[in-house]
């Protein structure tokens, strides 16, 4: 009998096996030992992973994200070698705003299965929320490479592109969202991505339909109500906007962003008293946030309370310590809301207090460094003209560009 010739070793395959073995050794020696034991030894029988996963899914459906996360973590401890549980845990953590933790658990899933498309997709979404857009794109493209039919990956890719603010190539985001829709038209992530792209293209009625469809799948997720409220606001339906955002607050009462958007919604309707109320509530949740001090300062300015506006806005521009001893770090000048609202409104507030000597240097910084920001440039120019004509004496006041 002729002896069969052995096939020559494939160096690429050998390298892959070596990497896989290294990953498993790392996971067994580093990741698994680091997981705390949930149950102490007792006569009580250990719950099955299936039972814990079912419980986690039930909590998720109810919008009880912290309980869902806890159950998934227990399921991981019951079987730390199941990548699917790490993926579901990471997905839930994203909805709960625990983005760095989500990245970690998506990577844990990849240690167990380096070719898992969904693990890459979830990691990409978490990185997007962290503002790490370059790595998010790398991860989501890897997810699509591994599984070109992964609808969630296309949905996340849509959001990553839009979050970068590059609207010159918005057609790419539209096309990718339509790809997600073609692959899985009924998925929550698909509806959310389509709603987001329709919102950013000004198609508000269609965006509302998509967010409503997502909410019909799970009406206990705060970010869906928040997003729907934002669309209603842009469509001029302030009452519906506030209603949806308050639902978001009920589901996530510790998130200051929702309260901040409610304050801006009321301000857009000229209801500055309510705007200040919600801005103060938002600030109470995170008193060290310069952004929240800035939002409150803008609301106070719009309500003609210039002295209190200055107290808040100077913390944004210069940093400092609040009356309660909370340290606030200043925000460097940058185009957009920081310049348009915080810096220029701070300068305009100073002019209304006959403090042009303090206001002019701020306006000069704006005019010198970010003259391309049309809103900030206009506000600074108006303030400079006011100071020149009034010699620091307030009269009719200065109205900033909205």
What does each model-found stretch correspond to?
Residues 1-47, 138-141, 145-156, 182-185:
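Long, contiguous interaction/recruitment modules in multidomain scaffold/adaptor proteins
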Residues 45-84, 88-98, 163-166, 189, ...:
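Alpha-helical segment of the N-proximal tetratricopeptide repeat
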Residues 60, 87, 94, 121, ...:
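Position-specific recognition of the canonical hydrophobic site in helix A of tetratricopeptide repeat
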Residues 78, 112, 146, 183, ...:
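Structural marker of alpha-solenoid helical repeat scaffolds
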């Amino acid at each position: 009998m002729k002896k069969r010739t052995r096939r020559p070793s494939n160096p690429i395959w050998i390298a892959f096996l070596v990497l896989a073995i290294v990953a498993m050794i790392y996971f067994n020696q580093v990741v698994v030992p680091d997981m705390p034991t949930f149950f102490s030894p007792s006569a009580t029988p250990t719950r099955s992973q299936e039972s814990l996963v079912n419980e986690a899914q039930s909590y998720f459906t109810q919008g009880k994200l912290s309980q869902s996360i806890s159950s998934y973590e227990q399921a991981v401890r019951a079987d730390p070698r199941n990548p699917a549980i790490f993926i579901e845990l990471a997905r839930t953590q994203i909805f709960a705003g625990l983005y760095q933790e989500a990245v970690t658990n998506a990577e844990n899933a990849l240690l167990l299965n380096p070719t898992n498309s969904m693990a890459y997709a979830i990691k990409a979404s978490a990185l997007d929320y962290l503002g790490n857009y370059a790595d998010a794109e790398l991860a989501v493209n890897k997810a699509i490479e591994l599984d070109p039919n992964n609808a969630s990956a296309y949905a996340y890719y849509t959001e990553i592109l839009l979050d970068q603010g590059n609207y010159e190539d918005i057609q790419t985001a539209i096309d990718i969202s339509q790809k997600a829709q073609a692959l899985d038209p009924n998925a929550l992530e698909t509806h959310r991505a389509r709603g987001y792209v329709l919102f950013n293209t000004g198609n508000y009625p269609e965006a509302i339909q998509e967010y409503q469809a997502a909410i019909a799948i799970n009406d206990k997720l705060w970010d869906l109500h928040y997003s729907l409220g934002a669309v209603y606001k842009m469509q001029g339906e302030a009452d519906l906007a506030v209603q949806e955002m308050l639902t978001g607050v009920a589901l996530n009462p510790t998130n200051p962003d929702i309260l901040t958007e409610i304050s801006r919604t009321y301000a857009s309707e000229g209801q500055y008293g309510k705007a200040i109320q919600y801005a103060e509530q938002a600030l109470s949740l995170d008193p060290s946030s310069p952004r929240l001090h800035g939002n409150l300062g803008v609301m106070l300015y719009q309500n003609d309370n210039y002295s209190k506006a200055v107290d808040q806005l100077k913390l944004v521009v210069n940093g400092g310590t609040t009356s309660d001893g909370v340290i606030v770090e200043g925000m460097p000048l940058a185009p957009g809301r920081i310049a348009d609202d915080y810096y220029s409104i701070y300068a305009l507030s100073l002019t209304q207090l006959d403090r042009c000597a303090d206001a002019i240097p701020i306006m000069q910084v704006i005019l010198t460094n970010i003259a391309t920001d049309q809103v900030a440039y206009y506000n600074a120019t108006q303030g400079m003209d006011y100071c020149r004509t009034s010699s620091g004496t307030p009269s009719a006041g200065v109205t900033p560009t909205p």
